[in-house]
Structures are given as C-alpha cells and as structure tokens.
Amino acid sequence: NMPAERERRMHSIHAYPAKFPAFITTKAIHKAEENNISVKTVADIFCGCGTVAFETVRSGKHFWGCDINPVATLIAETKSNVYQDGQLQDFFDRIIAAYKTYSVDKSNHIYSNERIQYWFDEEHIDNLLKLRSVIYLVVDDEFYRKFFLCAFSNILKSCSRWLTKSIKPQIDPKKQPKDVLSSYIYQVNMMRRANMENINEKYGEADIKRTNILDVNIDKPFVDLIVTS
C-alpha cells in the first residue's frame, strides 16, 4: 500500500539517479517488527544518497551504510543529520560575505584540468572555485561544512554546460548556465527549509562509510535488517 504521508523535503536536497521510494524502508521496518524481530540497527550496503539512512534515523534507529561514491556518502551524511538553523544562518552569512571579497588564485591546478574546462566556462570556474574556497575557509566545523558542500555539489550541473534533463553526460550548446551565487543561495535556503521539518524530532544515529562492502571486515552480525537496492 502506498503511504498517505508525503516524502520529507530532505529526500530532495540533492539530485541522484535511481532513488527508490522512501516508504520502502519504513514498511520494511514495520514488517520486521510485526514478525517479532527487534530492529535496532538497519543497514544499506549500497547506501547511495541516503534514502534508507534518512528513514532509519527518522524512526529513531541506528543506521549503518557504505558506498564507494564520495558524492553519495556526502549526501547521505547530510540527509541523516539535523542541524541548528541559527548556526546554519551564521555560517551562511559568513560564506556570502567572504564570497563577495574573495579573489581566486589563477594558478590553481583546476584551471589546467581539461574536463573542468570542457564542462564550465571560465567565469563559472572562477565563481565555483571562489565559493568552494570560502566554504572551507569560513566553515570550521566539519559537521556543518558537509551541509554546505552538499549544497555546492547540487548546483554544479545547473551551473555547467551539461544538458539539464539528461542523466548521461552531454553538452547542451544552447544552455545558459545558471549564476553561481544566486543558485547557491536558493539551494541552501531550500535545504534549510527541509532541515526545519526535522528539527524537533528525536533521531537515531547514522554511521556512513566511504568504502566497498567487500572490503569491510565483519567478525559477527551487527545489524538486524538490511534494506538495499
């Protein structure tokens, strides 16, 4: 049965291919508990962007997951945490202020990267490098830095020459890439609204690793339920 409740906004903070419906996780947990299985820890060994991670911690349970894709684990970690909005606002204000005065280093190796030059024009390379640099400069708390890096990651496609509606890498010769700063402001504010939906709930904890499950040494069973795809 399809759930009556809509998916939380947190599931939409970053584009990611082949996401499955969030309710599969909660249905699996409920089904296991109906069959007298005590579910304290849920795992997703190909955790992707963290659909299972978010729904698990929302249920007040512990999550363990891994993926070899660093972008996937960044999104999953961001989704499965709750942030103080006042602290987000403070860091965000400082990022914007620093961005407006920061000068990029034209000797940075990024300018000699052929693939970067292929996807981005020089103005967008300048502004994206500036934004990424000030995120690392201003946000000294790694927990919050991941939130702002996740927002940065999600604007890259719209600020590039990549065909907007295509999952496969494809140049759109007619595309006008979006402005970096306005795109980032919109993205962060959207993510803050998503975070506010979760602010007063008691969440479980998530343990997310960037690794291949085949490389993980498991001495004994440590999870009660695996939900993966």
Segments predicted by a language model, with ranges:
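Conserved phosphoryl-transfer catalytic core
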Residues: 70-138
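Conserved S-adenosyl-L-methionine
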Residues: 21, 28-101, 180-219, 225-228
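Alpha-helix initiation/capping motif
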Residues: 13-17, 117, 173, 177
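Short linear capping/connector segments at secondary-structure termini
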Residues: 5-7, 109-114, 166-172
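S-adenosyl-L-methionine
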Residues: 1-36
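Hydrophobic (often cysteine-bearing) scaffold residues that line and stabilize catalytic clefts
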Residues: 17, 21, 72, 124, ...
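SAM-dependent nucleic-acid methyltransferase catalytic core
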Residues: 125-228
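Short, charged/polar micro-motifs that form catalytic or ligand-binding hotspots
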Residues: 11-15, 66, 118, 138
